[in-house]
Design a protein with these regions (language model features):
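Residue-level signal for beta-strand positions within conserved beta-sheet cores that form or flank
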Residues: 1, 60-61, 81-84
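Arg/Lys-rich, positively charged N-terminal/basic patches that mediate binding to nucleic acids
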Residues: 1-34
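Short proline/glycine- and basic residue-enriched helix-capping loop/turn segments at helix->loop/beta transitions
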Residues: 45
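Residue-level signal for pocket-adjacent positions within structured domains
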Residues: 48-52, 90-93
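Basic/aromatic recognition patch in beta-strand/loop cores that engages polyanionic ligands
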Residues: 49-79
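Enriched for short, Lys/Arg-rich terminal
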Residues: 67-98
Length: 98
């Protein structure tokens, strides 16, 4: 059964900032990157445990996928049959709060 995908407000803001940064130089590349990121995230609705456990958090329900150059951190809410995208940030940056 597919999980429902939701986006935390912080993750939505992250996307907006990432798109703005890329689109500043190339709007088409910005749209292309966001589309490919959404495509990668969509797979989590069917395979929520496909991402690795985030080493910094060591919590089996907090996982991540890498969509270069970004880390997409998400939480599996099994009781609610839901995957919440918590944050999206450039992998070279420090860890933001969830």
């Amino acid at each position: 059964m597919a999980h429902e995908l939701t986006w935390a407000p912080a993750a939505r803001l992250d996307l907006k900032e990432i798109f703005g940064y890329i689109a500043e130089d190339d709007p088409i590349a910005g749209k292309k990157f966001i589309r490919s990121l959404f495509s990668a995230v969509e797979r989590l609705s069917v395979f929520p445990e496909s991402g690795r456990i985030v080493p910094e958090f060591k919590d089996v329900t907090t996982r991540e996928i890498i969509h270069r150059p970004c880390r997409v951190v998400y939480r599996i809410k099994a009781g609610q049959n839901q995957v919440e995208i918590a944050r999206v940030w450039h992998a070279a940056r420090g860890i933001p709060q969830l």
